[in-house]
Structures are given as structure tokens and as C-alpha cells.
Amino acid sequence: MNNEERLERQKNIRNFSIIAHIDHGKSTLADRILENTKSVETRDMQAQLLDSMDLERERGITIKLNAVKLKYEAKNGESYIFHLIDTPGHVDFSYEVSRSLAACEGAILVVDAAQGIEAQTLANVYLALDNDLELLPVVNKIDLPAAEPERVKQELEDVIGIDQDDVVLASAKSNIGIDEILEKIVETIPAPSGDPSAPLKALIFDSEYDPYRGVISSIRIVDGVVKAGDKIKMMASGKEFEVTEVGINTPKQLPVDELTVGDVGYITASIKNVDDSRVGDTITHADQPAEQPLKGYKKMNPMVYCGLFPIDNKKYNDLREALEKLQLNDASLEFEPETSQALGFGFRTGFLGMLHMEIIQERIEREFGIELIATAPSVIYECILKNGDKVIVDNPSKMPERDQIEEIYEPYVRATIMVPNDYVGAVMELCQRKRGQFINMDYLDDIRVNIIYDIPLSEVVFDFFDQIKSNTKGYASFDYELTGYKESNLVKMDILLNGDKVDALSFIVHKEFAYERGKALVERLKTLIPRQQFEVPVQAAVGQKIVARTNIKSMGKNVLSKCYGGDISRKRKLLEKQKAGKAKMKAVGNVEIPQDAFLAVLKMDED
């Protein structure tokens, strides 16, 4: 293909993604677009086609972004190439959304006709506007009995400033309005601007590892052309490779001769090391490099850390490999080795949030067959010591002693909660209980309120989302962003079993709640830890001070069962022997702790 043909083809390319709050019908709309452009054989069609992980199907959510090429014959008689980049909707995966948007010129904004605009809808709209994308608004699920499309159109105009005439009314499930959406994509979303004769610039927006072909990078070509056999260079790492294959996803991978401006496809170059093909990097030609790399997207830093330990200690190296492979597709996952007296060798692992943590744990157990014990998650605290040093604490067991600490700071988030009028009181009470500071409240219309609070991340991270949902019968929606650190009166609480500290059960708590948290936890552990041959005291301590204690009663073993009748001194001898044996056992006392006990630290708020 010469440059004129490439430029001609470029005019008919449209790159877009679909953004929406979780459950507003994004994956169903993607399915309908695939069907109506005849991109997928009817026999291959299945619900949530782009959600390729079993886990995504089971939970009905999108976790990984996915890119496909579609062909569309428009009503004006021209043939168009669409690249649809599917994105997740859950707040934990917002970095996946920002990666998808960096590869597009436009976005379809899907809003549920019954639910209206929700917190994450807004968060995603702001992301799209930051990337200068054209928005194509769609009100979905208009055939639901509870649908109020006119109210939602008005809301889109009032809250986001979208002209009501531009809104398409649709129902992805019933295939209503899909043809209009396809025509609107052609009309409203601009063609890619780029120069096929300029030096190559391609953005890596995703990558996966294949044991035979090495790293497969998903790329969007911004300038230039790339073919198999080209020598390429990664601009961030400076490493050079030879391209072995370029191709497109239809959703299956299909090799092609070349990728040019506006194309979204994949590239393989026998890259064996994960770090050499980092998401957000720019690919250029080794012999004629571009001067400036593309603006990547901001790296997402983990918000939550927890320890992952293999139940079978021999699988430590397998766990390292599993984490390395997952890290390739998931730039936000971080891990480093850690040892625990209670659990042996494992990794301190950083995640974006609790859903992200659950998904990674489930993937390790399913895809790599490694059974795990996870410790209670914690956030990152900053301690200023009396000697002026600053210490970052991502693991409660590393917290310096209280008498060395001058000040402790903890991360706060700005939480935006959209809630129906009737539940405002319940939500505000929950936020106060979670040490929240009230910032603002606006009425979006006569039924919905937007409440803004600053809340410590440690209070939000565990089950705040579930509690908001249960306090509002599932009607509230929630989004948050990190705002910075604030000074706080925090203490480290240790749990002692049989007089020994269990490092994996330590946690950091606000001083005001230390007593009740400690009391609730020891009571809970009493029910979770199986009874031993000897009595086991369970204590919660802050520094040297014990704030709560309970005992796990011993299992009585009847040593006299074999002693029929006979002399009392014989019975006494057996009982004395048992007593001595128990004392010895208690001295070496090794208490088996089940996995539930480590998670009990999280569940205290529910009591």
C-alpha cells in the first residue's frame, strides 16, 4: 500500500471505546455492535463475547480491556473500519479505562435509562474529556418498565452539558437503536490524525504473555507504518527487537502485512522479558526513531497491600512466576518477597482495591493451581520519627515502636456518593462512623443527591462499598480518588496467641476504636481457631498494654477410659502424666491458625 492509499483508508477509520458505570449494559452493547456489523459468525456468538476470562463471565463484569476490528458498510455507501476497545466499569479498574481511552478518538457513553448517571459514569466522562475524546451519549435499556429516558436525557444535559438532541435511545438487549449508534459513530467520532510517512510511533496499551511467541503487545499506531521484519525500539527502555508478526483482533488474532496510522492491532517480536514491553511505552523504528515518545498515561499506584503466602511452602517459586505473568498484563500489580514467622515465605503484594485483590487471588488459584493464604489488607502509612526520619509502612508488622514516632499520617480519599433522597441519613451516618469529614452535598434533581466526604482510605478499602449498597438497598453508587495524607492518632494492635505475637494478624487502628476492635477480634478468633489439647489465651495488645483477652478452652481427653475400676492412685498417676504432657505441649505451643482467622481482622465492622 502506498501513502496515498493509506491516507484514503485512514479517513474511514473510527477508534472508540464504550464507557459506563458497572451494570449499565456495556458488554451487551459491544455484543450487539459485533453482531450488527457481522463481525462474528452467529455460531461463535455468545453473551459477553469480549470478556474472555471465565472469571469475567461468572461475575458478569469486565476486568481486562479488549480490542477488536470491525467492518461497517455505512448508509452513505462507504465502507468503514471500526476499532472497538472494550473497557471495565468497576472503580478498581479505572486504569484499564484510561489505557483504552489513550488509544481512541471517541467514546460511547452508556447510561442506564432506569438508574441515570452514577458516580463512575462521571469519573469516566472526566477521563474521556482529559483525553480530548468526542462523546457519543447513549441511553440504554429504554424497554425496561422502570425506564425514564426523558429524565435521563435531561440529567445528561444538566450534569455533563450534553445536548439532548445528540442522545441516542437504545436497548442493547432488544437490539433497538443499534443501527443509529453505528451511523452516529461514523458522523461524530473523528478519523485518526497522523502521518503514515512520519517516523513510527505506536502506543502499547496492553500486553499479554504467550509461552511460545513471547510477549504479545496490543498497539495503536499514531504515526508511520510497521511490518514484520522491521527493527523496532522501545523508547522508554531503549531495547531493540525484530518484529516477527503484526496483526489485528477480529476477536481472534489474524496476521496482516502491515499496520498503519489509526490501526489498532498486535505485534510480536520474540520479546521474552515482561519488563521490555511495558504498557504505556512508545514503539518506534530503531534506524529512524521518532524524536519524542507519546504521552503515556499516569501509572496507577497500588492502594492496598496484603501478604500472599502459598499453603505449600515448596510452591514459593511457582507463586513468584504466577505474579510475574499476571504483572505483565496488569501494570498496577506490585510485589516483593516477605517472610512471616507464622506463615513462612511469601510476597507483599499491592493492589488497586479489594475487587482487584480478590480477582488476582482467584486467578492465581485457578490459572496456576496454587492454594494461598492471604493476610488482612492494609494501606500505606507514613511515620515521622522523633529523629526526623520518614518511614513508609505498608505492612503493620513493620510499624516502628510508638515511643519512636512523632507523627503518623494516613491516606485520605475524596468519596463521591450518589444516593436517592430517602437514604441520605443512612449514608451520612455510615460516613461519620468511618471517620469521614463532610465536604459538600448537591441535589442533582428532586430525587437524587450527590454527597462528598473525605474518608480515610483504610476505612473505605474493605467493605465500605458493600455497606453503602446494603444501607441504600443497592441504589447508591460510589467513586473515590486519593487526595493526600492527613495526620491521625493511630496505634498498632498485636494479637498474641499463647503469649506469642502472630505477625500476620497485626493491624493498625485509630486509638479511639482500639479497645472495641481488639475485643471484637479476640472474641471472633475464639470461635475460628480450633480447640487445642491445652488452653490457649488470645490477647489483643497495644504496645505493652493488653486491651482484651479471652481463652480458647482445651479439648478434654479422657485418659481414664482404659482404666477399668482399680486403684485410685493408678488414676491419679494417669491424670498427673496428662497434666505434665499438656504443660510441655503448651511450652512449645504451636497453634494451627485457619485462613478465616486472618480475614477476621477485616470483618470486625460487621459485628
From Swiss-Prot:
One of its GO terms (cellular component) is plasma membrane. InterPro entries: EF-4, EFG_II, EFG_III/V, EFG_V-like, EFTu-like_2, G_TR_CS, LepA_C_sf, LepA_CTD. It is a peripheral membrane protein. It is found in: Cell membrane. GTP binds at D23, H24, G25, K26, S27, T28, N140, K141, I142, D143. Residues 11-193 form the tr-type G domain. Keywords: Cell membrane, GTP-binding, Hydrolase, Membrane, Nucleotide-binding, Protein biosynthesis. One of its GO terms (molecular function) is ribosome binding. It catalyses: GTP + H2O = GDP + phosphate + H(+). GO terms for biological process: positive regulation of translation. Its EC number is 3.6.5.n1. SUPFAM superfamilies: EF-G C-terminal domain-like, P-loop containing nucleoside triphosphate hydrolases, Translation proteins. Its main location: membrane. Required for accurate and efficient protein synthesis under certain stress conditions. May act as a fidelity factor of the translation reaction, by catalyzing a one-codon backward translocation of tRNAs on improperly translocated ribosomes. Back-translocation proceeds from a post-translocation (POST) complex to a pre-translocation (PRE) complex, thus giving elongation factor G a second chance to translocate the tRNAs correctly. Binds to ribosomes in a GTP-dependent manner. Belongs to the TRAFAC class translation factor GTPase superfamily. Classic translation factor GTPase family. LepA subfamily. PANTHER family: TRANSLATION FACTOR GUF1 HOMOLOG, CHLOROPLASTIC, TRANSLATION FACTOR GUF1-RELATED. This is Elongation factor 4.
